[in-house]
UniProtKB/Swiss-Prot annotation:
An annotated Gene Ontology molecular function: DNA-binding transcription factor activity, RNA polymerase II-specific
InterPro entries found in the cross-reference section: Transcription_factor_GATA, Znf_GATA, Znf_NHR/GATA
Top-level taxonomy: Eukaryota, Fungi, Dikarya, Basidiomycota, Ustilaginomycotina
Protein name: Siderophore biosynthesis regulatory protein URBS1
GATA-type zinc finger segments: 338-362, 482-506
PROSITE patterns: GATA_ZN_FINGER_1, GATA_ZN_FINGER_2
Transmembrane segments: none
Region (Disordered): 1-164, 245-283, 300-337, 372-405, 442-472, 559-595, 643-679, 692-803, 841-940, 953-1019, 1040-1084
Source organism of this protein record: Mycosarcoma maydis
Feature: compositional bias, Basic residues: 752-781
Keyword vocabulary terms for this entry: DNA-binding, Metal-binding, Nucleus, Repeat, Repressor, Transcription, Transcription regulation, Zinc, Zinc-finger
PANTHER family: IRON-SENSING TRANSCRIPTIONAL REPRESSOR-RELATED (PTHR10071:SF335), TRANSCRIPTION FACTOR GATA FAMILY MEMBER (PTHR10071)
Ranges of Low complexity composition bias in the record: 23-51, 150-164, 1070-1084
Polar residues: compositionally biased ranges: 97-106, 128-141, 373-385, 961-970
Biased composition (Basic and acidic residues): 245-260, 650-659, 715-725, 875-888
């Protein structure tokens, strides 16, 4: 029904059907959607512009033009409104800002209040309240309104409006951006705008207001479609999408289109047609440009041609897809499509292993299944896009689709990018995307600028256009050229502190160096990093990860298991098979890791403990005693145990072996002489210890053998004991099979298997490899040996590299040289002792060993005359070297406990092992044998060895206990009296100079542990704290430390020992680094 020209309630609709390309503009704006062909007189709404309604409205109106310059300029309708036909401009400028009741003559009679609150165009069906409250309530009923019927609140809904409703200005060739909702509008020339505006309740005036991620803010807004003036904006929907890329514009538009009906008077004027029509006219061309940029940014260009579909529900598939998908706009417009499933929109574009661009779904599928997504999964995927999109895309505007452009580009590909495309790998390249996007924007802008906007609209819209163009240029054109190096190719555009666009390289350079990148550093091509191998099948087969070395609770280096080190050999296609292979290879990897663990720990121990772990005199003794045999044997053993351990490591739990290794309480179970006979044979046939004995044997043996019962069995035959106890766990069902072979070898040789040393190294697993050689012959109680077996089986497991063997050999040679020096010293001391100080030997029998019923400590070296007196009782018949080496079995547990936490097991071993040459020479001397083995506290021997190290070559070993005290009953005290300072220093990882401080005063045979700590601290004090001396009680660990007194005394003791040939051999033998020298006097 055409309305009379005076009708204020409705906007004049342009009778002339607009051109197809203008349909969108007319539909979106539906400028005079409800008005008759000639514009009705308008009431200028400008003075009462709703600038006060929402903070955003002010900015919005200011963008268009001054809100209050209605008279000077055509009334500026809020963005959402469609400019009315030019004929209506005069009427629009009508001075009255309020609706006249008389002016609405042709309109159904409405109360003035209603007319004030609602534009007559928003006339609702009878019975609908038009009060502001009702309007507000209706805002929340937008969904309801959309279905209630042709609400006049949205008379201009583009989908509801036919082309006949467009203005004459539509013919000017300026049309609004074909926003998604507008792109598919009907071409209906029906003159009756109201009839066309009125739709059946099924047709929602905001049919395109879908709850997409892009639309939700506006379309799902409660203020949307009911009689609020916001919905009356002609181009509400179109406007919504014009600046989809600009969030601030979106907010402003929302405020524009959904004003709060707070000011009735402003409402009337605000709703008035006059505001929107000129604004709309001026708005169309710039909006087109903006829309062009928007499309270039990624909205799919929509056909402006007439659409055959009448359904408001229909939204162009590509637009719908773009709104719904989270993919960047450029992705849509550049024509990116998944090389696997063909999808053109996806929340995230990924890259396939071959470098092709794939959608998020396909990328995730490949990631989890190591194979491409099947066709069946593709269509069901959420990001599958209708096939029509491609056709539309091809038809849409300038085609910059990746399918054509890369062929024509000159990019060499292979990660060297110049942004022009030309290879299959260019799809997804950021530089190429930038170029495509820029080309699209430029072409859009050119096509838009060809359409001349009406003068009025140009005047109104000019400032916003210039502003937007400036922003557009900055974001589009500027982004394609680095302001620093002027490059147009970069994987990522950044901004400098001034907001200028700079390339990734310049941005990173500035970020790192705080200055702009020199132009000379600019490169013509960008080398892109390939995160995925070029072909999916070519995946690295052997990736040796760096093994992180961690420290466990005991301060022992533990190499974290790196799964998949060997699993890489077979690269299964499915994650399940990969996991299975990883699990299967885990055990063998653990074996290899143990080998690495040992080495790493050896290095750590060398650094941290001053190479004490391997360079100790004890090891030297063993090496010398065994000669080259020890070395070869240790290597043989390492290889053997590595092989055997590799098998066992796979089956036995590494934790068991480790836990068994930890509690090291080595009780000397048999006199050294018992071992001496068998040492050579043991070396000859070094048993390969399987982990079999490691876990179970250690526990069972610990329980089986106590230091008390051990001596008996040890005396009976160490070999049987070894076979039985060390392999005791072989009885365990799980170990039986594994143990059988290795046990056969071990038991086959009556020789005790001197692998107990393995447990010594529990503290530093890495030193095992070396220690295997050195410690072959210090036989710790089977209990310990069990744990050692666990370690030996596991640690060496894995193949030993030739380089490792060579390195071990070099280390052993070095130690042999060091041991030679120690032996020379020991021989000198022994010579002086033989000269006349045999009583010292008598004075220092290892009564501690006797106390427990043990004969000489197991520490006596196998070689030398010591073997000559194998059966001799430790008390009197045992050779001097045996006596020297004897150690109180109870002292050993004590010491091991003390050491278990801080000191490495290798240190403990060192403490226990006697210097070989000294033993040999002493063994030949009956006097020493008669005196009985001197109690060799491991600590004393350790001090001696430490003193004999090359580092301390200038400092002779000084036994704190004077010769007389060696035979003191003080020896009855636990051997813990052995200078513990060495132990403490060991824990600190500092070489204690077993200088005088290391030995307690001559008077205190058994120095208090704290006193020993004091002495040790005293000697370390200079190293750690300079020369500061703590004299007050409580200054250092609560101990008074008369440092000078003790030092001088110990020095004098050492001097007297050296000078007087009558000095007890026990005091001097420590210098020979024979651990048998116990500070404690022999026990009677």
């Amino acid at each position: 029904m055409a309305l009379p020209p005076v009708k204020i309630a409705s906007r004049p609709a342009s009778p002339t059907p607009s051109h197809h390309h203008q349909q969108a503009a007319a539909a979106s704006s539906s400028s005079s959607s409800s008005s008759s062909h000639h514009p009705p007189p308008r009431i200028a709404a400008r003075p009462i512009a709703p600038a006060d309604r929402s903070p955003e409205r002010v900015s919005q109106h200011s963008r268009g033009a001054s809100v209050h310059d209605a008279d000077s300029l055509p009334p500026i309708r809020p963005r959402g409104s469609r400019p009315s036909s030019p004929s209506g401009h005069a009427a629009d400028r009508a001075p009255s800002s309020h609706h006249n009741a008389s002016s609405t003559a042709t309109v159904p009679a409405r109360s003035t209040a209603r007319s004030l609150f609602r534009d007559p165009r928003t006339l609702h069906p009878a019975g609908r309240s038009q009060s502001p409250i009702a309007a507000f309530r209706n805002r929340s009923q937008s969904s309801e309104r959309s279905r209630l019927g042709p609400s006049r609140s949205q008379p201009n809904s583009p989908l509801l409006q036919s082309s006949s409703l467009r203005h004459h200005s539509d013919a000017t060739g300026v049309h609004l951006p074909p926003i998604s909702s507008l792109s598919k509008e009907l071409v209906s020339d029906h003159p009756d705008c109201f009839a066309h505006r009125r739709r059946t309740p099924t047709t929602s005036p905001r049919a395109t207001a879908r709850l997409h991620m892009g639309n939700t803010f506006r379309d799902s807004s409660p203020a949307a479609s009911s009689g609020s003036p916001a919905t009356m904006r002609h181009d509400h929907l179109a406007y919504r999408h014009e600046h989809s890329a600009e969030e601030h514009a979106k907010m402003q538009r929302y405020s524009d289109e959904h004003p709060r009906a707070m000011n009735p008077t402003s409402r009337a004027s605000y709703e008035h047609e006059s505001r929107g029509m000129p604004y709309r006219d001026s708005y169309s061309a710039p909006s087109r440009a903006i829309e062009a940029s928007y499309h270039a940014n990624g909205a799919r260009p929509v056909h402006h041609a007439d659409s055959s579909t009448n359904s408001p529900q229909y939204v162009p598939g590509d637009v719908y897809e773009h709104e719904g998908s989270g993919s960047p706009p450029a992705a849509h417009h550049a024509g990116m499509r998944c090389s696997n499933c063909g999808v053109t929109s996806t929340p995230l574009w990924r890259r396939a292993p071959d470098g092709s661009t794939i959608c998020n779904a396909c990328g995730l599928y490949i990631k989890s299944h190591s194979t491409h997504r099947s066709a069946s999964n593709r269509l069901s995927g959420s990001d599958a896009s209708p096939p029509t999109h491609e056709a539309k895309l091809a038809a849409a505007g300038p085609s910059c689709s990746r399918e054509d452009d890369p062929k024509s580009g000159s990019c060499p590909g292979d990660g060297l990018c110049n942004g022009t495309g030309g290879t299959a790998s260019c799809s997804g390249c950021p530089a190429y995307n930038n170029n495509l996007s820029h080309a699209l924007k430029v072409s859009k802008r050119e096509s838009q600028t060809s359409e001349d906007p009406p003068p009025a609209r140009t005047a109104e819209r000019a400032p916003p256009v210039a502003e937007e163009k400036m922003d557009d240029d900055k974001s589009v054109v500027g982004a394609l050229r680095c302001t620093n190096c002027q490059t147009t190719t970069t994987p990522l555009w950044r901004r400098d502190e001034d907001g200028n666009n700079i390339c990734n390289a310049c941005g990173l350079y500035h970020k790192l160096h705080g200055t702009h990148r020199p132009i000379g550093m600019k490169k013509s091509v960008i080398k892109r990093r390939k995160r995925i191998p070029a072909n999916a099948t070519a995946q690295p087969t052997h990736i040796l990860d760096v093994i992180p070395v961690q420290m466990n609770a005991n301060g022992q280096p533990v190499i974290a298991p790196a799964a998949g080190r060997n699993a890489g050999d077979s690269t299964p296609k499915s994650t399940e098979s990969r996991r299975a292979s990883k699990k299967s290879s885990l055990t063998s990897e653990q074996a290899m890791r143990e080998a690495r663990d040992r080495e790493a720990a050896m290095l750590l121990m060398e650094v941290g403990a001053g190479a004490r772990s391997r360079n100790s005199a004890q090891e030297d003794d063993r090496i010398h005693q065994n000669g080259a045999l020890a070395t070869s044997t240790s290597f043989h053993h390492d290889f053997h145990s590595a092989r055997a351990g590799a098998d066992t490591a796979r089956t036995s739990h590494p934790d068991d072996s480790r836990s068994s290794k930890r509690p090291r309480q080595s009780y000397p179970l048999a006199p050294r002489e018992a071992y001496d006979e068998r040492d050579v044979s043991a070396i000859a046939s070094p048993p390969a210890y399987n982990e079999t004995h490691a876990a179970g044997a250690t526990r069972s043996q610990r329980s089986q053998r106590s230091p008390v019962d051990a001596p008996l069995t040890d005396r009976l035959g160490r070999s049987e004991l070894h076979g039985e106890s060390s392999h005791g766990t072989s009885n365990a069902p799980e170990h039986a099979a594994r143990a059988s072979a290795s046990d056969g070898a071990r038991l086959g040789s009556v020789v005790p298997h001197h692998h107990h040393h393995h447990h010594h190294h529990h503290a530093n697993h890495a030193s095992h490899a070396v220690h295997h050689g050195h410690h072959h012959h210090h036989h710790h109680p089977v209990t310990v040996s069990a744990s050692s077996h666990g370690h030996a089986g596991q640690a060496p497991s894995g193949m030993t590299k030739l380089s490792e063997v060579e390195r071990l050999r070099d280390e052993l040679l070095f130690e042999r040289r060091r041991i030679d020096e120690v032996l020379r010293r020991a021989e000198a001391i022994l010579a002086s002792a033989r000269a006349g100080n045999f009583h010292v030997e008598a004075a220092g029998p290892s009564t501690s060993g006797l106390r427990n019923g043990h004969e000489a400590s197991h520490e006596s070296p196998p070689t030398g005359s010591a073997q000559g007196s194998p059966g001799a009782d430790a008390r009197g018949t045992r050779s001097g070297h045996d006596s020297i080496k004897q150690e109180a079995p109870d002292a050993a547990p004590r010491r091991s406990k003390a050491f278990s936490n801080s000191s490495s097991s290798s240190e403990k071993d060192e403490l226990e092992s006697p210097p070989p040459s000294a033993h040999q020479q002493l063994a030949s001397q009956p006097l020493v044998a008669a005196t009985g083995a001197q109690p060799a506290s491991r600590r004393n021997s350790f001090e001696q060895r430490m003193a004999s190290l090359p580092v301390m070559a200038a400092v002779p070993l000084k036994r704190s206990s004077p010769p007389s005290t060696v035979s003191n009953p003080a020896d009855n005290r636990p051997l813990s009296i052995a200078p513990q300072p060495a132990r403490k220093a060991t824990a600190w990882g500092i070489d204690t100079r077993s200088t005088p401080a290391a030995s307690p005063r001559s008077g205190e045979k058994r120095a208090r542990a704290d006193e020993m700590d004091e002495d040790d601290d005293h000697w370390n004090w200079d190293n750690l704290y300079g020369k500061a001396k703590l004299e007050k009680a409580g200054d250092w660990r609560g101990f008074a430390r008369p440092v000078e007194d003790r030092r001088s005394q110990s020095k004098s003791n050492g001097v007297t020992r050296r000078e007087s040939s009558s000095t007890p051999i026990a005091a001097r033998l420590p210098v020979a680094s024979s651990p048998s020298q116990a500070v404690s006097a022999p026990r009677t």
